[in-house]
Amino acid sequence: MNTIAPNLDGKHLRIGIVQARFTNEIGSQMLKVCCRTLQELGVADENITVATVPGALEIPIALMNFASSEKFDALIAIGVVIRGETYHFELVANESGAGIGRVALDYNIPIANAVLTTENDAQAIERIGEKASDAAKVAVECANLVNLLLEEQFEDEE
């Protein structure tokens, strides 16, 4: 049996991040934690590109444009959707999540989804560090995995 070990070496990786500004006080903290973790994993600061969008529903279109540029090894989506008193929460949570997944599959690029969906601000604040750090690790590990698999596929075709 062949096993591919997880690789968290971010050296030489290019990471794009899209952060929703709605609930920015939480999202901006997540962005800081995420970038710090990427740097700890070896991703050079000049290889991290950040774009912000108004809200979670706009994240997929920005990710799609990052992905279509073919300049990135992985992408990260950061945002916060907090339940209110209307159905809008479900719409935003479901549609942003579906859009993020669609971009990943359509463009064959790993996307770490760090869009929090919580009942209240306190739950979101509690999850800032872990979710943002995990997103950075997921992006690096999956970028390395996809790059390795693509290299092997290319070698098999020769």
UniProtKB/Swiss-Prot annotation:
Residues that bind (2S)-2-hydroxy-3-oxobutyl phosphate: E85, T86, R127
* Transferase listed as a keyword: yes
Q: Which reaction does it catalyse?
A: (2S)-2-hydroxy-3-oxobutyl phosphate + 5-amino-6-(D-ribitylamino)uracil = 6,7-dimethyl-8-(1-D-ribityl)lumazine + phosphate + 2 H2O + H(+)
Which keywords accompany this UniProt record? Riboflavin biosynthesis, Transferase
Chain positions recorded as 5-amino-6-(D-ribitylamino)uracil binding sites = F22, A56, L57, E58, V80, V81, I82, N113
- Any stretches that span the bilayer, and where are they? none
InterPro entries in alphabetical order? LS, LS/RS, LS/RS_sf
What EC number(s) has UniProt assigned to this enzyme? 2.5.1.78
GO terms of molecular function = 6,7-dimethyl-8-ribityllumazine synthase activity
Q: In which pathway does it act?
A: Cofactor biosynthesis; riboflavin biosynthesis; riboflavin from 2-hydroxy-3-oxobutyl phosphate and 5-amino-6-(D-ribitylamino)uracil: step 1/2
Q: Give the annotated active site.
A: H88
What does the function comment of this entry state?
Answer: Catalyzes the formation of 6,7-dimethyl-8-ribityllumazine by condensation of 5-amino-6-(D-ribitylamino)uracil with 3,4-dihydroxy-2-butanone 4-phosphate. This is the penultimate step in the biosynthesis of riboflavin.
In which family does this protein belong, per the annotation? Answer: Belongs to the DMRL synthase family.
Q: What is this protein called?
A: 6,7-dimethyl-8-ribityllumazine synthase
Q: Which organism is it from?
A: Neisseria gonorrhoeae (strain ATCC 700825 / FA 1090)
